């Protein structure tokens, strides 16, 4: 059954209000008419339970591994758990949507934070998160992902430096650097590591 998971919602909830807000957010996303007919199977973090924190961690890692898309719900406070879940999804090449409460935090993740783009361990390609602060944009991204209607543009801010940018969120989802030393060092090590 876990291999049927479409969307994993990564979040951290510390108090009753956090649980209520997360439940409302999940309802707004997954009951939206644009995607309701998909009958997406998603992990609702407000009803998660396990016998202990070790079991909970193992279950959640398995769900992240099996899901098709991960939504990272950036709350007021950050937590290691949801950061690790987003990192696992990015490092396995999955689409990751960062949903932020406000545009300031969204801009931080989109334009400043270096780890919203991580290397896909199987290909060596940089995989970046799509970042938004609007629930409707999360819904639209899910619709486009599952209908295979994603739209991208290729940017070249400097000679030899390329960014593949998701159009609606203006988020870089793939990056190629023009730093020759970094490129050669990376691929020499990565290729050797993969062959071992």
What residues fall within each predicted segment?
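Conserved catalytic or regulatory cores that recognize and/or transform ribose-phosphate-containing ligands
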Residues: 1-196
């Amino acid at each position: 059954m876990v291999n049927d998971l479409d969307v994993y919602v990564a979040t951290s909830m510390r108090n009753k209000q956090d649980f209520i807000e997360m439940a409302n957010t999940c309802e707004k996303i997954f009951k939206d008419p644009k995607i309701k007919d998909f009958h997406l199977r998603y992990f609702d973090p407000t009803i998660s339970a396990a016998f202990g924190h070790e079991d909970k961690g193992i279950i959640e890692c398995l769900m992240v591994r099996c899901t098709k898309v991960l939504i990272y719900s950036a709350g007021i406070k950050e937590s290691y758990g949801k950061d690790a879940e987003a990192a696992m999804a990015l490092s396995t090449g999955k689409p990751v949507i960062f949903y932020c409460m406000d545009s300031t935090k969204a801009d931080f993740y989109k334009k400043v934070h270096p780890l919203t783009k991580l290397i896909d361990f199987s290909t060596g390609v940089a995989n970046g998160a799509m970042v938004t602060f609007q629930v409707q944009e999360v819904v639209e991204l899910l619709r486009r992902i599952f209908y295979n209607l994603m739209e991208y543009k290729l940017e070249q801010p400097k000679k030899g430096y390329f960014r593949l940018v998701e159009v609606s969120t203006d988020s870089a989802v793939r990056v190629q650097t023009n730093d020759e030393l970094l490129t050669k060092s990376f691929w020499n090590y990565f290729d050797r590591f993969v062959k071992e």
